Design a protein with these regions (language model features):
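Peripheral terminal and inter-domain segments
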Residues: 382-726
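Short, glycine/proline-biased beta-turn/loop segments that scaffold the active-site neighborhood
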Residues: 118-132, 223
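Bacterial N-terminal signal peptides
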Residues: 15-25
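Boundary at the C-terminal end of the N-terminal hydrophobic targeting segment
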Residues: 30-34
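Short, surface-exposed loop or secondary-structure junction motifs
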Residues: 69, 74, 78-80, 134-343, ...
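Bacterial N-terminal signal peptides that target proteins for export
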Residues: 2-16
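Catalytic cores of secreted or luminal carbohydrate-active enzymes
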Residues: 352-402
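Short, conserved catalytic-motif segment at the N-terminal edge
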Residues: 35-95, 115-117, 124, 177-178
Length: 726
């Protein structure tokens, strides 16, 4: 019965969306064609130049569309600092998760062709897909596109490499086969990269074509998107904007999750996709999608799921982050938005179908999709003024806390305690010097660190710090307690709120087995040699800690941020259920016995104990790669020179005692200098192969630090490794 009610409600919503799309196409064209946007462009250019200067980014590019016109296209900064070359309209940027829009279009193309049904089980098309939770059979194609599959989140192992890794899709399938669902399929929408990676498997199974080939044939070619490509092979120098750390160019970034985040494109090319969507599926005389499919993409997919605090910031459509773009919704204008963030690139893609406007921006770090979306809000609001649809651009709201009101003991007690999300463990405590105030502390490898203090209840019902417009309140839903965050968003003219963290209650104290693992470290062994896991600042170390003051939890990860509940001596289980983004990217720790050692699987990455790493002795050392072909780690007790023989090894990396990369190479024989005691050598090679490492200690070299010191060092802060956020 519930299914039939949901189906009728969804059909009614899509029918309404279809009417809106068709009316927008008919009504908006004349106004868009007649408008002079000189004022919009003048203001937007000044804002873009200010954003470039404030962010310190090397470059970015944008496009503004009205109706069928590409009204404004401009680039800023330098695509190549070494040659002072500016980007041009054809310079490609990684667009991160904006790639999901292509995956959605590809899927809806198959729906229009009658090859795929959105609400059919995914296993109908990809029978090789499986998970440990039997409910995986309930996952539909739609759930892959609206983030409601219940998947843990993202397979980060081998996600970012220097060269394309064609085995990533199979690796995701293999990883899902040994994972559990975090929620019942369809129960709540939580941002999920792996769902879109599964679209690659869907396209391959249904069409016999690779995903990249299908998108090229069915989307890029019909739309004339000639400067859009997946990084399957190297790009010619000068065709893409380089990302930098300081003034040092980064290797070209390759995200192996093609459908979820791997595309390189330009704002000009993406503006063609935007015009197709604004036109209800047609562009340049070619119909790519039916109007019904475009309307389905733009319909709110979260209205029937568990979503106790709807947020315009995250109101998922099919592919879209929000089908009520908050900056436009604040002035009564409909909009769809998708953002993309990876390690090196950022993008924002906004379409206002009723107003017949669109804005696309792409850039390099340290920009963000949020800053580019905010720029887009500014441009589109000014464009609405130029159209006559708005009298004036809305003024930013005052950035100040509302007046204080007295909090009851119950209101204070509801806020206090421990809270968690996928990347945060938070403690809220009464302020020592004010019984009406609260302090926030975040758990780090160095213990509790204060993040906010003196928060008091205000007249809006939330706790704010003095001078802050951001406020916090509690709510109970689905049998769980949440801390909600309210804030002023985007261009500063609207308020929004979302569920931030979930209450953590005391659990059964940790067993002796888990207690023995606290404070220890493990090292990754099964990534591709050019994986970003092994690069500077990568999550090469896995550490385990507890939550001081709260029994029954371990915090796990490269930076000890995700709380887990051990359910037995070998499994640290995920448990968070926060709609939106708060429980995205969950992973479980599975302890596996390797001889006398405990190794840990975290997602698709396998870690070996750091404390039992073999040491290289002076003279010749034979290193043999095991039957699994895992990488081999060795410690260096003293400073000295290492010579790695020809044969056996294929790649090497040298790390200092704090796991910073000192060097890497793939040419042999290799001569490597370890400048101090306590360095680490990482070797890659074929299963069963052997190589010889000859160590010549430096004169007067001192012995390295012992294992206990190494474990202590593992708990110190390390460079942040930025994973693709959306």
């Amino acid at each position: 019965m519930r299914h039939h009610i949901a189906t009728r409600a969804r059909r009614a919503l899509v029918a309404l969306a279809l009417v809106i799309v068709l009316l927008a196409v008919m009504a908006g064209t004349a106004a868009a064609r007649a408008t002079d946007y000189a004022a919009t462009i003048k203001d937007g250019r000044a804002a873009a130049q200010a954003l470039l200067a404030q962010s310190g980014a090397a470059s970015f590019s944008l496009a503004f569309v009205s109706g069928e016109r590409l009204v404004w296209q401009e680039t800023f900064g330098e695509a190549d600092k070494a040659t002072s070359t500016p980007p041009d309209a054809d310079t490609m940027y990684g667009i991160g998760s904006v790639s999901k829009m292509l995956a959605t279009v590809a899927t809806m193309k198959l729906v229009d062709q009658g090859e795929v049904e959105l609400d059919a089980p995914f296993t109908r098309y990809v029978p090789a897909f499986s998970m440990l939770s039997p409910a995986y059979r309930q996952i539909t194609v739609r759930m892959m596109l609206d983030h409601s599959s219940g998947f843990p989140g993202s397979t980060y192992g081998d996600l970012v490499t220097d060269t394309y890794f064609p085995g990533y899709l199979q690796q995701v399938l293999d990883t899902l086969a040994m994972e559990r669902l975090k929620t019942t399929p369809g129960y709540m929408s939580v941002y999920c990269n792996d769902g879109f990676t599964m679209i690659e498997a869907l396209v391959l199974a249904v069409t016999g074509k690779s995903y990249a080939a299908f998108v090229q044939d069915e989307v890029f070619t019909p739309l004339g998107m000639e400067h859009s490509a997946y990084p399957l092979t190297p790009f010619p120098d000068g065709t893409y904007a380089k990302a930098y750390r300081g003034d040092v160019a980064r290797p070209r970034e390759v995200l192996n999750m093609l459908a979820s985040g791997g595309l390189y494109s330009t704002p000009s090319d993406m503006s063609r996709l935007a015009r197709m969507l604004m036109n209800g599926g047609a562009y340049g005389g070619t119909r790519l999608l039916s109007a019904a499919s475009v309307a389905e993409m733009g319909a709110d997919q979260t209205f029937l799921s568990f979503n106790p605090l709807p947020s315009n910031m995250l109101r998922y459509g099919l592919g879209w982050d929000s089908v009520t773009e908050p900056g436009l919704a604040a002035v009564g204008v409909g909009g769809w938005v998708k953002g993309g963030d990876s390690v090196d690139y950022h993008a924002s893609f906004t379409v206002a179908p009723q107003a017949r406007l669109a804005f696309v921006a792409t850039g390099v770090a340290p920009l963000s999709s949020t800053s580019l979306q905010t720029l887009g809000q500014r441009v589109l609001l000014h464009a609405l003024v130029d159209q006559g649809a708005l009298r004036r651009v809305p003024r930013p709201l005052p950035v100040a806390a509302p007046p204080v009101k007295r909090a009851s003991a119950a209101q204070l007690a509801a806020m206090e305690g421990y809270w968690g999300s996928f990347n945060t463990v938070l403690r809220v405590s009464a302020s020592a010097d004010d019984p009406q105030a609260l302090d926030f502390f975040q758990l780090t490898a160095n213990g509790w660190v204060p993040t906010a203090s003196g928060l008091r209840l205000r007249t809006d019902g939330r706790f704010h710090a003095d001078g802050s417009a951001s406020g916090y309140s509690t709510m109970t839903a689905g049998g769980r307690r949440y801390l909600a965050a309210g804030f002023i968003g985007g261009y500063g003219h609207y308020r929004d709120a979302l569920l931030w963290v979930q209450k953590l209650a005391p659990e059964t104290p940790l067993s002796a087995a888990w207690q023995s693992r606290l404070g220890k470290a493990w090292l990754a062994v099964n990534e591709q040699p050019d994986s970003a896991v092994y690069a500077e600042g990568g999550p090469v170390l896995l550490t385990l800690g507890d939550v001081p003051g709260l029994p029954g939890y371990v915090v796990s990860g490269p930076y000890e941020t995700q709380p887990l509940i051990p359910v037995d001596d070998t499994l640290g289980a995920m448990f968070l259920q926060i709609p939106g983004v708060g429980s995205r990217d969950l992973e479980e720790d599975l302890v596996e016995q390797h001889g006398s050692e405990e190794w840990i699987w975290r997602g698709s990455t396998l870690y070996r104990p750091q404390a039992t790493m073999p040491a290289l002795a002076a003279g010749a050392n034979t290193v043999t790669f095991g039957a699994e072909g895992y990488a081999e780690w060795r410690s260096l007790p003293a400073a000295g020179t290492l010579t790695i023989a020809v044969g056996g090894a294929t790649t090497w990396r040298l790390y200092d005692p704090d796991m910073a990369v000192l060097g890497a190479g793939a040419t042999f024989p290799a001569t490597v200098t370890a400048p101090q005691a306590g360095c680490y050598l990482l070797l890659f090679g074929p299963a069963g192969a052997s190589t010889t490492v000859t160590v010549a200690p430096a004169a007067g070299a001192q012995p390295g630090r012992d294992a206990a010191t190494a474990e202590k060092r593992a708990a110190t802060p390390r460079p942040t490794y930025v994973v693709p956020l959306r």
